[in-house]
Amino acid sequence: MTATLERRESASLWGRFCDWVTSTENRLYIGWFGVIMIPTLLTATSVFIIAFIAAPPVDIDGIREPVAGSLLFGNNIISGAIVPTSAAIGLHFYPIWEAASVDEWLYNGGPYELIVLHFLLGVCCYMGREWELSFRLGMRPWIAVAYSAPVAAATAVFLIYPIGQGSFSDGMPLGISGTFNFMIVFQAEHNILMHPFHMLGVAGVFGGSLFSAMHGSLVTSSLIRETTENESANAGYKFGQEEETYNIVAAHGYFGRLIFQYASFNNSRSLHFFLAAWPVVGIWFTALGVSTMAFNLNGFNFNQSVVDSQGRVINTWADIINRANLGMEVMHERNAHNFPLDLASVEAPVVG
């Protein structure tokens, strides 16, 4: 006797919708996080494209001197940007209905806040969607954990830093030259290059690139040939096969002889954990560093650390960097301040 089990049809439209959202058979997994992710990222992307092309100038410093960022107002792909929300708005939530008109909303840089808040919500939901799909497939959760590093970095520059500085106008502009301007001003005001957490981030990014290149080249160079010399080595493998495609012992032996034995991994799991953890931890630290510098806990300051027996300063490289920082700072918001804060906060020396 044969028993036939039929899949029970969900009685309601809502039930069928739930089944569709959580199905792992879809070409692209939706998930409950995806229900929020899709509209928020579509909104952020659409507004970014429209504003990058056609947004009018924005009064970023709140001093009635609008700065143009869009293509139709004289910029190109390199110089164009979504200009941050005006300092006159500060940290206020500024949706379109809070402004007297759309023109006022555009003048005060409303699109920046709209894009950033939707984008951050969207990428957080993307991270949640990674966890959700892993959970439904019975996988471990580390893909979402790794993605938390760029999410933390984006949150630091687009949300935590403006909160610490008191205004969305201090957030990173959404453009190529705007990003570099943000970096230069950040160095001038916070000496980020002398912050240990930024140094860890640099080691994470560049080290991760090096390790990725080393791993990929070693694996590609130690493939197990399953074909003749007249055929491509790639023809000897099929997706999902049980057999290994490369010889980790050969790769370990090569690298162990190239440097020394214990510089090479002989365990695939520990190797791939290291490849994932190195850049992720580095970027976590950088995001943490930016978040602390947001509240003006800045990089190390070794200015005027060396003096002679008469108390005269002997300039070191730290003093050269400090002079460069001051130079960058006086060029930033040059019409908003008479002097940068570092120069205005001390009494002028007596000359004579």
Swiss-Prot record:
Tell me the InterPro entries matching this sequence. Answer: D1/D2, Photo_II_D1/D2_sf, Photo_RC_L/M, Photo_RC_L/M_CS, PSII_D1
**Site described as Stabilizes free radical intermediate, positions?**
190
**PANTHER family named among the record's database cross-references:** PHOTOSYSTEM II D2 PROTEIN (PTHR33149:SF12), PHOTOSYSTEM II PROTEIN D1 (PTHR33149)
What gene is this protein a product of?
A: psbA
Lineage, opening ranks: Eukaryota, Viridiplantae, Streptophyta, Zygnematophyceae, Zygnematophycidae
- Which coarse location class applies to the principal site listed for this UniProt protein? plastid
SUPFAM superfamilies noted in UniProt: Bacterial photosystem II reaction centre, L and M subunits
What protein is this chain from?
Answer: Photosystem II protein D1
Family matches, as CDD domains: Photosystem-II_D1
Positions of a quinone binding: 215, 264-265
Q: Which residues carry this modification: Phosphothreonine?
A: 2
* GO biological processes: photosynthetic electron transport in photosystem II; response to herbicide
From which source organism is this entry? Zygnema circumcarinatum
Q: What is its EC class?
A: oxidoreductase
Query: Where along this sequence does the record place binding of pheophytin a?
Result: 126
Anything else the record notes?
Answer: 2 of the reaction center chlorophylls (ChlD1 and ChlD2) are entirely coordinated by water.
Q: In UniProt terms, what function does this protein have? A: Photosystem II (PSII) is a light-driven water:plastoquinone oxidoreductase that uses light energy to abstract electrons from H(2)O, generating O(2) and a proton gradient subsequently used for ATP formation. It consists of a core antenna complex that captures photons, and an electron transfer chain that converts photonic excitation into a charge separation. The D1/D2 (PsbA/PsbD) reaction center heterodimer binds P680, the primary electron donor of PSII as well as several subsequent electron acceptors.
Specify which residues bind chlorophyll a PD1 according to the UniProt entry for this protein.
198
Provide the Gene Ontology terms for cellular component.
chloroplast thylakoid membrane; photosystem II
Q: Which UniProt keywords apply?
A: Acetylation, Calcium, Chlorophyll, Chloroplast, Chromophore, Electron transport, Herbicide resistance, Iron, Magnesium, Manganese, Membrane, Metal-binding, Oxidoreductase, Phosphoprotein, Photosynthesis, Photosystem II, Plastid, Thylakoid, Transmembrane, Transmembrane helix, Transport
Spell out the molecular function terms from Gene Ontology.
chlorophyll binding; electron transporter, transferring electrons within the cyclic electron transport pathway of photosynthesis activity; iron ion binding; oxidoreductase activity, acting on diphenols and related substances as donors, oxygen as acceptor; oxygen evolving activity
Query: What does it catalyze?
Result: 2 a plastoquinone + 4 hnu + 2 H2O = 2 a plastoquinol + O2
At which positions is [CaMn4O5] cluster bound?
170, 189, 332-333, 342, 344
Q: How is the cofactor bound?
A: The D1/D2 heterodimer binds P680, chlorophylls that are the primary electron donor of PSII, and subsequent electron acceptors. It shares a non-heme iron and each subunit binds pheophytin, quinone, additional chlorophylls, carotenoids and lipids. D1 provides most of the ligands for the Mn4-Ca-O5 cluster of the oxygen-evolving complex (OEC). There is also a Cl(-1) ion associated with D1 and D2, which is required for oxygen evolution. The PSII complex binds additional chlorophylls, carotenoids and specific lipids.
